[in-house]
């Protein structure tokens, strides 16, 4: 199905847009086969919502300049949905975005993330963050910030974000999501985290509770 505007696909946290390892599986190829023009966010894998949102805003401008299109449609997964909302509502991208579709995005955050960040001592958190940041830098991030990325996924941070961001008129926003029915049915590490997340967030995909998925005019 050819679309009027190109599609910008925005990945979630701790992933990159690699040429030979597609984050989105077979979805882009199927869309392109039917005439859709696909672009990728090409943003860092671990950064605050504000920093990632700025990268997405810059990427939108690049796509518009390259294609001559007036707008883009955004499909965003996980934290990418928060990053895209920030770009649209805070950074002036609303006139250039026709629609935003979020997939398993923690719009209301993850209570489990609050619990972990409050439980783990600062010294241990910094050690884990340093290890992740070193790895992510090798994978292509210029300035990875593990703690900023995780911190912005907490329920407390998302409550504040939702108070600050107003969905603009003129951008169609919809959401979708899926949950693991059985922990054994998920891939590592989601099969391990599913039961723990359930204690705090109910039905979930291994990281994000279903109650957080819904945002916008339609939810499926």
Go through the PLM ranges and name each one.
Residues 12-16, 44-47, 79-82, 105-109, ...:
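Solvent-exposed loop/turn segments at secondary-structure junctions
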Residues 21-22, 110-116, 184-190:
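Short aromatic-enriched loop/helix-cap "lid" or pocket-rim segments at secondary-structure transitions
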Residues 11, 38, 54-157:
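Serine-dependent carboxylesterase/thioesterase catalytic core
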Residues 163-220:
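C-terminal catalytic-base region of ester-bond hydrolases, centering on the histidine
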Residues 8, 39, 101, 174-176, ...:
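Hydrophobic/aromatic beta-strand patches that form the interior of the parallel beta-sheet core
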Residues 27-28, 88, 97, 162-163:
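Short amphipathic alpha-helical segments and helix-helix/interface helices
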Residues 2-72:
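Active-site catalytic motif of lipid deacylating hydrolases and related acyltransferases
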Residues 2, 92-95, 165-168:
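Short, conserved loop/helix-junction motifs that constitute active-site signature segments
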């Amino acid at each position: 199905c050819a679309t009027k505007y190109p599609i910008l696909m925005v990945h979630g946290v701790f992933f990159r847009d690699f040429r030979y390892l597609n984050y989105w599986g077979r979805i882009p190829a199927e869309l392109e086969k039917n005439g859709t023009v696909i672009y990728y966010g090409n943003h860092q894998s671990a950064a605050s919502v504000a920093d990632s949102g700025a990268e997405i805003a810059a990427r939108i401008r690049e796509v518009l300049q390259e294609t001559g299109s007036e707008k883009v449609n955004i499909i965003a997964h996980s934290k990418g949905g928060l990053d895209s909302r920030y770009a649209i509502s805070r950074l002036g991208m609303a006139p250039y975005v026709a629609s935003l579709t979020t997939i398993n995005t923690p719009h209301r955050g993850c209570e489990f993330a609050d619990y972990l960040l409050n439980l783990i001592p600062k010294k241990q958190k910094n050690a884990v963050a340093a290890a992740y940041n070193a790895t992510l830098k090798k994978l292509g991030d210029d300035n990875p910030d593990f703690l900023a990325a995780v911190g912005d996924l907490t329920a407390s941070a998302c409550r504040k974000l939702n108070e600050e961001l107003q969905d603009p008129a003129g951008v169609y926003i919809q959401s979708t999501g899926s949950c693991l029915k059985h922990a054994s049915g998920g891939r590592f590490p989601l099969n391990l985290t599913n039961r723990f997340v359930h204690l705090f967030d109910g039905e979930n995909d291994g990281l994000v509770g279903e109650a957080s998925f819904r945002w916008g005019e339609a939810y499926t």
